[in-house]
Amino acid sequence: MNAVAEMPSPIVFSDSAAMKVAELIEEEGNPDLKLRVFVQGGGCSGFQYGFTFDEIVNEDDTTMTKNGVQLLIDSMSYQYLVGAEIDYKDDLEGAQFVIKNPNATTTCGCGSSFSA
């Protein structure tokens, strides 16, 4: 039996992020898409965030649903994202997804890489 971890998450998936993801999924025309957020080695601070669409929920994924949008985080990335907020900003600096991560001890100027 394949069991996908679905538990209350200390990760915040903001309304604005969920609304933007829903808009992007609608543009793609594939209602099976889910937003996958991950952490990988790289960037100027050691780790960097990644965002992609995925149709598949893996066994070790933690899932969250907000406003009908499903967010997926693999178990390795989850440990770095506990307590973080995944948000979408549209301001003078531009429109982008941002992660506010209290686990990041340092971040680079662009905010896309960090060390923990």
UniProtKB/Swiss-Prot annotation:
Keyword Glycoprotein set for record: no
GO terms, molecular function: 2 iron, 2 sulfur cluster binding; 4 iron, 4 sulfur cluster binding; iron ion binding
Binding sites annotated in the UniProt record for iron-sulfur cluster: 44, 108, 110
The entry's keywords: Iron, Iron-sulfur, Metal-binding
SUPFAM superfamilies recorded: HesB-like domain
Superkingdom of this protein's organism: Bacteria
GO BP of this protein: iron-sulfur cluster assembly
Cofactor note: Binds 1 iron-sulfur cluster per subunit.
Transmembrane segments: none
Alphabetical list of Pfam families matching this protein: Fe-S_biosyn (PF01521)
Quaternary state and interactors: Homodimer.
Family: Belongs to the HesB/IscA family.
Name under which the protein is recorded: Putative iron-sulfur cluster insertion protein ErpA
Species this protein is from: Janthinobacterium sp. (strain Marseille)
Biological classification of the source: Bacteria, Pseudomonadati, Pseudomonadota, Betaproteobacteria, Burkholderiales
Gene responsible for this protein: erpA
